[in-house]
Amino acid sequence: DGRRSEPFREEVTFNKATMKPIRLLTAPHPKYAAAALNDGLRGKRVFTYGNWAGWQDDDMEAVIDLGRQEEIAQVAFNALLDYGSHIMDAAGAKVWVSDDGETFREVYGEHYPEIPYGAVKRILRHEANFSPALRARYVKLRVMRSKQLPEAYFDRNLRPFLFIDEIYVY
């Protein structure tokens, strides 16, 4: 019919973890695979687009091989909050670093406050900042999931999901 559509655009964000080898220590839900964790494409607020990896029974835990020892000033990740789809924000995170990929030392641990039920669907960025910067080749990240939906939720028998998109290392 001669009509054209708008060009498709996708912004790619590069960081030290982008497209680096990643080893999952916990498996995501089969419907929400983990290819999106460090592909440089930021997930949208609609989790079904495929840019999100989802966990329902385990915390997310992964090791990224940066390829060589790098300076690390920040490790960050995006989490999705969508109470309507029983997706909750991360409950906390831990970061470890290693030079050999076998012996890790913990450099960060934080628990996050629960966001009140009914909050607007959104993407939340969580950051672990290091000053002075660290040096390591391997970064291990564990993102803890909420174990139960809020008391006000319409069906507390459902198990909440944790959806993670990009893992960033700067």
Locate predicted features.
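Short, compositionally stereotyped local motifs that mark structural "simplifiers"
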Residues: 1-53, 57-60
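Aromatic, loop-rich ligand-recognition surfaces of beta-strand-rich domains
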Residues: 44-108, 124-170
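Residues that form or immediately flank small-molecule/cofactor binding pockets and catalytic motifs
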Residues: 27, 100, 111-112
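A short, polar/proline- and glycine-enriched secondary-structure boundary/capping micro-motif
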Residues: 34-36, 86-87, 116-120, 152-153
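Solvent-exposed serine/threonine-rich low-complexity stretches and specific carbohydrate-binding patches
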Residues: 106-117
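Short, surface-exposed secondary-structure junctions/capping segments
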Residues: 24-30, 120-131
